[in-house]
């Protein structure tokens, strides 16, 4: 029965999608069966969609035949978000259009633009794309936003949720909505009143529960990308704003993101970084807390296992804090460095505090930080998981 549904779906999409953009052969299905992670699911059909109209029709037909759909942009996810054993819709190449507002403070992006490319576009205007995951040179906007991939510098103050202004989406039944367009909102409100009423009902239910509302605020004051994003129900009154921000971190489970308008951030032209070494992790953590009110833009803690994984020879059992400061002028940068040194004066560092403003030097520090995840993973002893050894798992088998 299921096979018949896929065959019927294939027949119908063949009427508007060229054959060279539909993959059903064994070899290519195998190739598309994995992303950057180590999971594998073999899709039944892979479709390279060209535009929003095609996606809308593809989803409407999938809804008609009750067939699951997964979306993929670059496929740099590590947790299997962009693999499928059903229908895989790819929106990478040909989804690279963008527009910038006259004041350069907003940028509208299609999902197939690589994050680093967005920064290249904005750099001449002194602006940047705030989310900066380690995979920013490969990850595309669609995946960055839908996975709420934040990265090393944007923290929670400038992640996708904070930067998003509006979204153009396609719902599971093929319905299109642009939350930033009054006409689209009006049409959606007219045709989907019960849907909007349900959003409002959930919003009010959450807000009327003070304990739950406080817990949500607390959870999202720190990095939190687990599960669906509940913060919009607490923050926004307008149901369309709630819908737009629900997309962030939804991993494509709620809708297809065909376009997103986001705030841009000021790009400081001068920066300096230092690798600060402490004899123990407690001192390192205390130093991070002390630096928080200062002109510190990022402080990344690298524990002894992380340092060992990249063959750091400074010492054994140390903890490092990779620290960065930025400024608009060289004078401001030097003043920032001196202020940070003053803040750290009560702390004993293993090596003298040395900030470098040379890109060829500090880029090596950040390259180390970006590569920590696979480096640490490579040191894991075979037969172990991140928490429990396989032998212990077997001991509890029934």
PLM regions: where:
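N-terminal flexible segment immediately upstream of the FAD-binding catalytic core
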Residues: 1-60, 64, 74-105, 134, ...
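Generic non-transmembrane alpha-helical segments
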Residues: 8-19, 57, 61-65, 121, ...
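Flexible, glycine/charged-enriched surface loops at secondary-structure junctions
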Residues: 19-26, 72, 129-133, 206-227, ...
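Secondary-structure transition/capping motifs at alpha-helix termini
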Residues: 63-68, 96, 124-129, 236-237, ...
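FAD-binding subdomain of flavoenzyme oxidoreductases
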Residues: 97-100, 107-111, 115-288, 293
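Phosphate/diphosphate-binding loops
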Residues: 152, 156, 162-165, 278-280, ...
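Conserved small/polar residues in nucleotide/adenosyl-binding loops
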Residues: 391-398
């Amino acid at each position: 029965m299921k096979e018949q549904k896929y065959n019927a779906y294939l027949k119908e999409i063949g009427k508007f999608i060229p054959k060279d953009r539909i993959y059903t052969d064994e070899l290519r299905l195998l190739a598309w069966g994995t992303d950057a992670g180590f999971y594998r699911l073999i899709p039944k059909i892979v479709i390279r969609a060209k535009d929003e109209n095609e996606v809308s029709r593809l989803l409407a037909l999938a809804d008609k035949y009750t067939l699951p759909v997964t979306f993929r942009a670059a496929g740099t996810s590590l947790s299997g978000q962009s693999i499928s054993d059903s229908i895989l819709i790819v929106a990478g190449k040909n989804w690279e259009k963008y527009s910038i507002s006259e004041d350069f403070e907003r940028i509208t992006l299609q999902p197939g633009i690589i994050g680093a490319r967005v920064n290249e576009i904005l750099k001449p205007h002194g602006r940047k794309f705030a989310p900066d995951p380690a995979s920013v040179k490969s990850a595309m906007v669609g995946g960055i936003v839908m996975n709420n991939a934040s990265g090393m510098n944007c923290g929670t103050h400038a992640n996708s949720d904070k930067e998003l202004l509006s979204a153009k989406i396609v719902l599971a039944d093929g319905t299109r909505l642009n939350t930033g367009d009054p006409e689209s909102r009006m049409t959606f409100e007219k045709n989907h009143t019960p849907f909007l009423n349900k959003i409002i009902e959930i919003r009010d239910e959450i807000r009327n529960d003070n304990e739950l509302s406080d817990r949500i605020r607390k959870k999202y004051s720190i990095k939190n990308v687990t599960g669906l994003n509940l913060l919009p129900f607490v923050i926004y009154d307008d149901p369309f704003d709630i819908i737009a921000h629900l997309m962030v971190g939804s991993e494509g489970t709620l809708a297809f993101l065909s376009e997103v308008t986001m705030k841009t951030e000021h790009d400081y032209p001068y920066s300096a970084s230092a690798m600060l070494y402490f004899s123990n992790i407690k001192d390192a953590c205390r130093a991070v807390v002390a630096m928080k009110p200062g002109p510190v833009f990022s402080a990344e803690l690298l524990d002894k296992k992380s340092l060992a994984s990249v063959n750091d020879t400074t010492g054994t059992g140390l903890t490092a804090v990779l620290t960065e400061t930025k400024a608009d002028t060289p004078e401001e940068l030097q003043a920032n460095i001196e202020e940070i040194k003053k803040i750290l004066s009560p702390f004993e560092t293993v090596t003298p505090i040395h900030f470098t403003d040379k890109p060829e030097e500090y880029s090596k520090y950040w390259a180390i930080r970006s590569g920590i995840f696979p480096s640490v993973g490579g040191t894991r002893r075979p037969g172990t998981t991140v928490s429990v050894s396989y032998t212990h798992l077997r001991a509890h088998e029934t």
